[in-house]
Amino acid sequence: MKQKTGLQMSSSLPVMILLNLSGGTQDACSYFLRDHVFANAQTGNIVLMGCYLISEDLRNSIRYFLPVAFFALGVLMACLIHSRFRHTGKIHWRHLVLTLEIILLFIVGFIPGQLNWLANGLTSFACAMQVQSFRTVRGSAYASTMCIGNLRSGMDHFYKAITEKRKDELKTAAIYLTAIGSFTIGAACGHLTNHFSYRTIWISCGLLILCFLLMLIEEEDDLEAVEKKERKELKMEQKELKEEQKELQKEKAELKEEQHIIQELDEKIQHH
């Protein structure tokens, strides 16, 4: 699909909220249901992996290493999709990322507890693709699957809003606060694990499907606006062309009249 407008639909506020809700749900499901492993917060996994390594507990250190490895592979996959499909006109590459993420998380809902390492790995893989592919909201960088960066950026913009009395900085700070709030609400969905068990991750699938559809609708509206603008510009160009043709005809008429006057003067000179 063509990208002709300044603000892409993937950077809109509704899409950001849906992605953060999904990110919070993913983390809650992996932590409460899958051996207390973080799907998104790889820093926590690395800390625990290091602690178990020092304790010479190889089994548990591997348990926390695998999500980190899958996360790294997920980033590479998102980069590959972006590289291969960013110039295609049929579908936006981010739609492909969302499609793959939805499929993976849907599969995770069927994986039994005996294969928690695989479930956590696939969830981390999907999370990495999401955080790599959706990195800005209204021109500001953010993360849809973790909060520390959003908290830091939000407080930075809030400080500037207070000290410099800038409303735009306050609005940006509010966007980061919204990101953290939506992630928290998504994480609260972890309470539903008592009712739906491993299927709770499908809440994340539903949120991502809504995100996918919202991006499609906004893309269609965006293309219609672009086409309308192009038609208007074409009419303006046609109008300008007609005016130029009129000016050219007028100049030709004036030139012809001047030539006629010169011819008359030549005849008078010859006559004298």
Label each residue range with its predicted role:
Residues L234-E237, L241-E244, L248-E251, L255-E258, ...:
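The feature captures the hydrophobic core positions of alpha-helical coiled-coils
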Residues K2-K235, E264, Q270-H272:
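Alpha-helical transmembrane segments of multi-pass membrane proteins
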